Amino acid sequence: QNAFPGVTNKLLAKDVDVVFAASAAAVEKLGAPEKTLVVGNPVRPEILNRDRAAARAAVHAGDRTVILSFGGSLGARRINEVVAELCAWEQANDLPVLHLHATGSRGVKLFEDLEAKNHFAPGANLVVKEYIDNMPDLLAAADLVISRSGALTLAELEAMGRASILIPSPNVAENHQYYNALELQNAGAAIVIEEKDLTGEKLVQTVSAMLAQPGKLAEMGKNARSLSVDDSLDRITAALLKLVKTP
Protein backbone atom coordinates (compact mmCIF):
# COMPACT_ATOMS: atom_id res chain seq x y z
CA GLN A 1 0.00 0.00 0.00
CA ASN A 2 2.70 2.47 0.96
CA ALA A 3 5.59 4.16 -0.85
CA PHE A 4 7.91 2.88 1.88
CA PRO A 5 7.36 -0.87 2.41
CA GLY A 6 7.72 -2.33 5.86
CA VAL A 7 10.14 -5.03 7.02
CA THR A 8 7.62 -7.86 6.69
CA ASN A 9 6.82 -6.94 3.10
CA LYS A 10 10.51 -6.79 2.22
CA LEU A 11 11.11 -10.24 3.72
CA LEU A 12 8.10 -11.83 2.02
CA ALA A 13 8.91 -10.25 -1.36
CA LYS A 14 11.91 -12.58 -1.71
CA ASP A 15 9.83 -15.76 -1.52
CA VAL A 16 6.51 -15.02 -3.26
CA ASP A 17 5.65 -15.38 -6.95
CA VAL A 18 4.39 -11.84 -7.51
CA VAL A 19 4.49 -8.58 -5.56
CA PHE A 20 1.95 -5.78 -5.92
CA ALA A 21 3.27 -2.27 -5.26
CA ALA A 22 1.22 0.90 -4.96
CA SER A 23 3.81 3.05 -6.73
CA ALA A 24 7.08 2.91 -8.62
CA ALA A 25 8.85 4.36 -5.58
CA ALA A 26 8.21 1.16 -3.63
CA VAL A 27 9.58 -1.21 -6.28
CA GLU A 28 13.29 -0.67 -5.60
CA LYS A 29 12.78 -0.70 -1.84
CA LEU A 30 11.04 -4.09 -1.99
CA GLY A 31 14.16 -5.65 -3.49
CA ALA A 32 12.41 -7.85 -6.05
CA PRO A 33 11.90 -5.67 -9.15
CA GLU A 34 11.71 -8.61 -11.55
CA LYS A 35 8.45 -9.83 -10.00
CA THR A 36 6.96 -6.57 -8.74
CA LEU A 37 4.02 -4.98 -10.52
CA VAL A 38 2.89 -1.39 -9.96
CA VAL A 39 -0.87 -1.66 -9.47
CA GLY A 40 -1.79 1.35 -7.32
CA ASN A 41 -4.34 1.05 -4.53
CA PRO A 42 -7.95 0.17 -5.46
CA VAL A 43 -10.51 2.84 -4.58
CA ARG A 44 -14.25 2.61 -4.18
CA PRO A 45 -16.20 2.90 -7.45
CA GLU A 46 -18.14 5.85 -6.07
CA ILE A 47 -14.90 7.81 -5.78
CA LEU A 48 -14.36 7.53 -9.53
CA ASN A 49 -17.96 8.17 -10.51
CA ARG A 50 -18.99 11.24 -8.48
CA ASP A 51 -20.47 14.24 -10.30
CA ARG A 52 -18.54 17.34 -9.20
CA ALA A 53 -21.22 19.87 -10.17
CA ALA A 54 -23.89 17.95 -8.26
CA ALA A 55 -21.62 17.54 -5.24
CA ARG A 56 -20.87 21.27 -5.12
CA ALA A 57 -24.54 22.12 -5.50
CA ALA A 58 -25.37 19.80 -2.59
CA VAL A 59 -23.13 21.80 -0.22
CA HIS A 60 -24.21 25.15 -1.72
CA ALA A 61 -20.65 25.95 -2.75
CA GLY A 62 -21.51 28.43 -5.47
CA ASP A 63 -18.32 30.04 -6.75
CA ARG A 64 -16.50 29.67 -3.45
CA THR A 65 -13.30 27.68 -2.96
CA VAL A 66 -14.19 24.55 -0.99
CA ILE A 67 -11.66 23.44 1.62
CA LEU A 68 -12.13 20.00 3.18
CA SER A 69 -10.14 19.10 6.30
CA PHE A 70 -10.10 16.03 8.51
CA GLY A 71 -7.76 13.98 10.67
CA GLY A 72 -9.42 10.57 10.74
CA SER A 73 -12.42 9.09 12.54
CA LEU A 74 -10.93 9.67 16.00
CA GLY A 75 -9.56 13.05 15.03
CA ALA A 76 -6.04 14.46 15.29
CA ARG A 77 -5.55 17.05 18.02
CA ARG A 78 -2.84 19.03 16.23
CA ILE A 79 -4.83 19.18 13.00
CA ASN A 80 -7.88 20.42 14.90
CA GLU A 81 -5.77 23.11 16.59
CA VAL A 82 -4.23 24.52 13.43
CA VAL A 83 -7.41 24.21 11.37
CA ALA A 84 -9.16 26.28 14.04
CA GLU A 85 -6.64 29.06 13.44
CA LEU A 86 -7.18 28.72 9.69
CA CYS A 87 -10.96 28.98 10.09
CA ALA A 88 -10.57 32.07 12.28
CA TRP A 89 -8.37 33.68 9.61
CA GLU A 90 -10.84 32.83 6.86
CA GLN A 91 -13.71 34.42 8.78
CA ALA A 92 -11.74 37.46 9.93
CA ASN A 93 -10.86 38.21 6.30
CA ASP A 94 -14.31 37.34 4.93
CA LEU A 95 -12.79 35.04 2.32
CA PRO A 96 -14.97 33.49 -0.41
CA VAL A 97 -14.36 30.04 1.04
CA LEU A 98 -16.60 27.21 2.18
CA HIS A 99 -14.71 25.18 4.77
CA LEU A 100 -15.89 21.67 5.67
CA HIS A 101 -14.14 20.22 8.72
CA ALA A 102 -14.44 16.93 10.59
CA THR A 103 -13.16 16.99 14.16
CA GLY A 104 -13.22 13.24 14.82
CA SER A 105 -14.86 11.72 17.88
CA ARG A 106 -12.11 12.88 20.25
CA GLY A 107 -12.05 16.40 18.87
CA VAL A 108 -15.64 17.57 19.28
CA LYS A 109 -15.25 19.32 22.65
CA LEU A 110 -11.75 20.53 21.78
CA PHE A 111 -12.94 22.22 18.60
CA GLU A 112 -15.85 23.88 20.41
CA ASP A 113 -13.33 25.33 22.87
CA LEU A 114 -11.11 26.46 19.99
CA GLU A 115 -14.05 28.23 18.36
CA ALA A 116 -14.52 30.30 21.51
CA LYS A 117 -10.79 30.90 21.94
CA ASN A 118 -10.20 31.97 18.33
CA HIS A 119 -13.47 33.88 17.90
CA PHE A 120 -15.06 32.05 15.00
CA ALA A 121 -18.17 29.93 14.60
CA PRO A 122 -19.83 27.50 12.20
CA GLY A 123 -22.17 29.18 9.76
CA ALA A 124 -22.68 29.77 6.07
CA ASN A 125 -18.94 29.52 5.33
CA LEU A 126 -17.99 26.84 7.85
CA VAL A 127 -19.52 23.42 8.44
CA VAL A 128 -18.12 21.40 11.36
CA LYS A 129 -19.02 17.74 11.85
CA GLU A 130 -17.75 14.99 14.10
CA TYR A 131 -17.48 12.47 11.29
CA ILE A 132 -17.80 12.50 7.51
CA ASP A 133 -20.16 9.79 6.31
CA ASN A 134 -20.33 11.01 2.70
CA MET A 135 -16.64 11.35 1.87
CA PRO A 136 -17.02 10.70 -1.89
CA ASP A 137 -19.45 13.61 -2.17
CA LEU A 138 -17.28 16.01 -0.18
CA LEU A 139 -14.12 15.04 -2.04
CA ALA A 140 -15.96 15.67 -5.29
CA ALA A 141 -17.00 19.13 -4.08
CA ALA A 142 -13.59 20.10 -2.66
CA ASP A 143 -10.89 22.23 -4.28
CA LEU A 144 -8.34 21.70 -1.52
CA VAL A 145 -8.01 18.88 1.02
CA ILE A 146 -6.07 19.09 4.30
CA SER A 147 -5.46 15.64 5.79
CA ARG A 148 -3.11 12.91 6.92
CA SER A 149 -1.38 10.88 4.22
CA GLY A 150 -2.42 7.28 4.61
CA ALA A 151 -2.11 5.31 1.39
CA LEU A 152 -5.82 4.91 0.73
CA THR A 153 -6.59 8.56 1.45
CA LEU A 154 -3.97 9.54 -1.12
CA ALA A 155 -5.33 7.06 -3.66
CA GLU A 156 -8.71 8.76 -3.35
CA LEU A 157 -7.18 12.24 -3.69
CA GLU A 158 -5.40 11.08 -6.84
CA ALA A 159 -8.52 9.46 -8.27
CA MET A 160 -10.52 12.63 -7.64
CA GLY A 161 -7.71 14.92 -8.78
CA ARG A 162 -7.60 17.07 -5.67
CA ALA A 163 -4.93 19.49 -4.51
CA SER A 164 -3.87 18.83 -0.94
CA ILE A 165 -1.91 19.94 2.08
CA LEU A 166 -0.67 16.75 3.70
CA ILE A 167 0.28 16.41 7.35
CA PRO A 168 1.80 12.94 7.79
CA SER A 169 1.07 11.20 11.06
CA PRO A 170 4.28 10.92 13.09
CA ASN A 171 2.87 7.89 14.91
CA VAL A 172 3.25 5.26 12.17
CA ALA A 173 5.85 2.61 11.39
CA GLU A 174 8.98 3.85 9.61
CA ASN A 175 7.38 7.25 9.04
CA HIS A 176 5.69 5.76 5.96
CA GLN A 177 3.03 8.49 5.72
CA TYR A 178 5.77 11.04 5.09
CA TYR A 179 7.11 9.02 2.16
CA ASN A 180 3.57 8.59 0.81
CA ALA A 181 3.04 12.35 0.93
CA LEU A 182 6.43 13.10 -0.59
CA GLU A 183 5.41 11.36 -3.82
CA LEU A 184 2.53 13.79 -4.30
CA GLN A 185 4.65 16.78 -3.38
CA ASN A 186 7.34 15.75 -5.87
CA ALA A 187 4.65 15.53 -8.55
CA GLY A 188 3.40 19.04 -7.77
CA ALA A 189 0.13 17.67 -6.42
CA ALA A 190 0.52 18.50 -2.72
CA ILE A 191 2.39 20.49 -0.11
CA VAL A 192 3.74 18.49 2.81
CA ILE A 193 3.99 19.94 6.31
CA GLU A 194 5.45 17.61 8.91
CA GLU A 195 3.74 17.80 12.29
CA LYS A 196 6.97 18.93 13.98
CA ASP A 197 6.88 22.01 11.73
CA LEU A 198 3.12 22.55 11.85
CA THR A 199 1.71 25.76 13.30
CA GLY A 200 -1.48 27.66 12.68
CA GLU A 201 0.53 30.49 11.16
CA LYS A 202 2.31 28.13 8.75
CA LEU A 203 -0.98 26.57 7.64
CA VAL A 204 -2.54 30.00 7.10
CA GLN A 205 0.47 31.14 5.09
CA THR A 206 0.37 28.00 2.97
CA VAL A 207 -3.35 28.26 2.20
CA SER A 208 -3.06 32.00 1.60
CA ALA A 209 -0.29 31.49 -0.95
CA MET A 210 -2.29 28.81 -2.75
CA LEU A 211 -5.44 30.93 -2.92
CA ALA A 212 -3.46 33.93 -4.17
CA GLN A 213 -2.37 32.09 -7.32
CA PRO A 214 -5.20 31.77 -9.85
CA GLY A 215 -5.32 28.25 -11.24
CA LYS A 216 -2.89 26.86 -8.65
CA LEU A 217 -5.34 24.44 -7.06
CA ALA A 218 -6.58 23.25 -10.45
CA GLU A 219 -2.99 22.67 -11.59
CA MET A 220 -2.18 20.68 -8.45
CA GLY A 221 -5.38 18.70 -8.87
CA LYS A 222 -4.42 17.84 -12.45
CA ASN A 223 -1.03 16.65 -11.22
CA ALA A 224 -2.70 14.49 -8.58
CA ARG A 225 -5.01 13.00 -11.20
CA SER A 226 -2.02 12.01 -13.32
CA LEU A 227 -0.84 9.74 -10.48
CA SER A 228 -4.09 7.79 -10.24
CA VAL A 229 -4.20 4.14 -11.27
CA ASP A 230 -7.88 3.88 -12.14
CA ASP A 231 -7.66 0.23 -13.21
CA SER A 232 -5.89 -0.92 -10.05
CA LEU A 233 -8.39 -3.68 -9.31
CA ASP A 234 -8.25 -4.93 -12.91
CA ARG A 235 -4.45 -5.06 -12.79
CA ILE A 236 -4.50 -7.06 -9.57
CA THR A 237 -7.20 -9.44 -10.81
CA ALA A 238 -5.43 -10.05 -14.13
CA ALA A 239 -2.13 -10.79 -12.41
CA LEU A 240 -3.75 -13.21 -9.97
CA LEU A 241 -5.63 -15.05 -12.73
CA LYS A 242 -2.40 -15.37 -14.70
CA LEU A 243 -0.64 -16.68 -11.62
CA VAL A 244 -3.19 -19.40 -10.82
CA LYS A 245 -3.31 -20.53 -14.46
CA THR A 246 0.47 -20.89 -14.66
CA PRO A 247 1.55 -24.56 -14.32
Model-derived segments and spans:
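Short, structured coil segments at secondary-structure junctions
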Residues: 14-16, 31-34, 95, 122, ...
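Active-site-proximal region of nucleotide-activated glycan assembly enzymes
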Residues: 1-53, 58
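A short, well-ordered alpha-helix in the C-terminal region of glycosyltransferases
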Residues: 216-230
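C-terminal alpha-helical cap of glycosyltransferases
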Residues: 229-247
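A donor-sugar binding/catalytic signature common to diverse glycosyltransferases
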Residues: 135-176
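Short acidic/histidine- and often glycine-rich active-site loop of Leloir-type glycosyltransferases
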Residues: 29, 156-159, 175-187
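Donor-nucleotide binding loops and adjacent catalytic segments primarily
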Residues: 52-145, 178-182, 186, 193-202
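Short, well-ordered beta-strand core segments
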Residues: 19-20, 36, 145-146, 164, ...
